[in-house]
Amino acid sequence: MRVVVTGWTGQVVQAMLERVPAGVEVVALRRPEFDLAAPKTVAPALRSAKPDVIVNAAAYTAVDQAESEPELALRVNGEAAGEAARAAAALGVPMIQISTDYVFDGTLGRPYREDDPVGPISAYGASKLAGEQAVAAATENHAILRTAWVYSPFGKNFVRTMLRLAETRDEIGVVADQHGCPTSALGIADAIFAVARNLTDRPNEAALRGIFHMVAQGEAAWADVAEAIFAEREALGGAPVRVKRIATADYPTPASRPANSRLDSARLAEIHHVRLPQWQGALSSCVRRLLTSQ
């Protein structure tokens, strides 16, 4: 199975390149030949890569910056996703689109299911929703995988930021009134490969297509995640760091974040037989890897 992925520098693609299963070849497209900011480059690059399945993990992910350049976010996350899906349809191959919890407004009192109403409250969220809609309109043979609170040993993410701040501080303020599912990019990579295999091996099963939520088991506030990071760091000999639990209002940002980013992944488990691990164990492994590799 030849998996062609977009988003060369992103956490998910770096994780996929590390976790390639036997019998799978991963081709990661990169600029300048493939540039989501220039959507007309998308189809030619995908055609030349000769995929069995396309995974669009590339995205404009600067959530706050998107508020000041929404057109660019929409072009990258919306228009280019549609171009990729049209290319997949023309090639007759499945398309996997990676999406986000930010398509919801965060007001629901339980974890979001796939059929709950969407309502993004940021330019980034709106652009990702546009991407979902463009993919669904362009090809029936798709799976849209929504994930949330992604971290990994790669790139910029919450775990690496907390560890960096801990080097110079003994107390760090962290938001305690946003709740979600911290999800390792390594677990996401494994899930993507499983879904890709299902789509390619069982092309006539319509149930395998559509929207699926893909997050680790369990839930937490950002402050809980920070406390778990610092506890692991301290267990490895680091100095104690105290988490000051603050409200979202105490840490204003240009883009609004959903207060509830919890996603229900039951459908992914039921249909694709994919279940990501509990967030605590995966987080511990990530922190240990980062600290012991220094």
Question: Which residues does each predicted region cover?
Answer:
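Active-site "gating" loop of Rossmann-like NAD(P)-dependent oxidoreductase/epimerase domains
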Residues: V63, S68, D101-I121
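Active-site Tyr-X1-5-Lys
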Residues: G119-A143
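Amphipathic terminal alpha-helices
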Residues: P277-Q294
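NAD(P)H-binding glycine-rich loop region in Rossmannoid oxidoreductase-like domains
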Residues: P39-G78
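NAD(P)-cofactor binding segment of oxidoreductase domains
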Residues: S68-I96
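Mid/C-terminal beta-alpha module of Rossmann-like enzyme folds, strongest
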Residues: A191, N198-P254
